[in-house]
């Protein structure tokens, strides 16, 4: 089981029926196929259980997990430039004239087509967890762009997907700043030793702290000077550690050994049973963490 490392959280903005059986059919039309000789990139769905299953969805207790795979061809620009330059020089020498821009552009396309079949591929996978009980979709992505790209593939596969980023009533950075300034955190949360502070004015600078006592006078001075806490490392109930950002994303999730060892008694050889047990454990913990965080940050914005 792949334990999520990041969470971008989205709210289903209206009632929508997401049944795993129906979704299985819809995703299969967009299942992953490798790049052909002239493809720069391809994206599609693969089984979240890897080689252990052909199913594109996996559901337990109203929680669905799916996985998108992307293949990208790697063509370093110096290589393209070198090939293109050689071609331009050869043609200009043969024709005794300088090539026009349109001719050079056309040559660049030719160079790309000739290089593509020989290019190496880079693969990445992005997991999505759909919580049909709480009407949330979580993407294991460190950037909003990667999350949005994966949701766009899901939207295309399902026909529609009414989701919006989870938004809170109060600006997150104001709440985080108040926690550090007052040295008081909501029940269940403890401050760790890492943060980012930004000046309200764009040219006012950024401070990134690691292994730092965030309740120290040094940090208090920055807050007094008008800097806001935009990232904060937190511990939740000694079970999950994370870095919370002012955009609502949770990064560098780390589950405690005690938590991860809860399913150690399950035979490692029984992949499906262990996958289910770990998925149930992870989603129940993260659902509780998200609920606690929303409350601690002042509640969800009412649209």
From Swiss-Prot:
Biological-process GO terms, alphabetical: DNA recombination; regulation of DNA recombination
Subcellular location(s) per record: Cytoplasm, Nucleoid
UniProt keyword annotation of Signal present: no
Record-linked InterPro entries: RdgC
One GO cellular component, as annotated: cytoplasm
Keyword Ion transport set for record: no
Pfam families: RdgC
Disulfide bonds: none
Coiled coil: none
Protein keywords: Cytoplasm, DNA recombination
GO molecular function: double-stranded DNA binding
Family statement drawn from the similarity comment of this UniProt entry: Belongs to the RdgC family.
Alphabetical list of PANTHER family matching this protein: RECOMBINATION-ASSOCIATED PROTEIN RDGC (PTHR38103:SF1)
Protein function: May be involved in recombination.
Protein name according to UniProt: Recombination-associated protein RdgC
